[in-house]
Amino acid sequence: LGISVVPVQVGTALAWAELNHVLWLPALAALIAAMLIQIGTNLYNDAADFERGADTPDRLGPERATAQGWFSAAQIKRAALISFSGAFLIGIYLAWVGGWPIILIGLLSLLAGYAYTGGPKPIAYSASGEIFVFVFFGLLAVCGSFYLQTNSLTAEALICAGAIGLLAAAVLLVNNYRDLETDEQAAKLTLTHYLGRERARQLYILLILLPFALPVAFNHRYDGSWLVVLCLPFALWLLHRFSTEPLGRGFNDILANTAKLQLAYGTLLSLGLIL
């Protein structure tokens, strides 16, 4: 769940750096709502991928509940609906605190959570999946969390949001790179399909390295942001692993470590902003 926790954490930390205080209840509510939206999206994705034939015995990724027969697709979809409903209820409170911008972000996030694998043209079955993640788990989540605290939007918030969004997109890129062949068999034509493996590998390098330019972009506004450099060796190790790992289940570990990199980067950035 780090992909949903990190942007709220960073947006709130930046607001703390700006205001020297935090509205803790709205911050906690935003965190829970973001987690519920991610849970709902993952659950619906689990059921929808099974129904569309994307989860086959040849799939390299971890076992999934619907494909393994642990639960029916209908049961998983009901669980997703419960999760989305919980996020909606929390969103009512957040809308009362933050006004119409938060209402808009909340409604868009819920709609996107369904549209990711639902509807006639699912986002996950197109080349726009990484863009979706960049926008919703980067730009909107960080900036929304910051706005909830400050009722404003700054260049620094956008810079932080961009960095977190790039790393979130890298997580999805690894997933789609690993599953390219089985995805193509199910007509799931992701960005990796259109780029090819070599250019997808080059894109992964950019997504991982560009966030480390953030301290430079801040131009001494928040010198503590240089803390993120502490996880640069981890990032470089990941890039080497991605480039040399034979295609197979080893990419599950690369996927998990890419998510860990985003968590480490977000945590170090948050600490650097508030210390």
What residues fall within each predicted segment?
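Membrane-embedded alpha-helical segments that form the functional core of polytopic membrane enzymes
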Residues: 19-44, 103-111, 155-174
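Topogenic membrane-insertion module of multi-pass membrane proteins
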Residues: 1-29, 120-121, 133
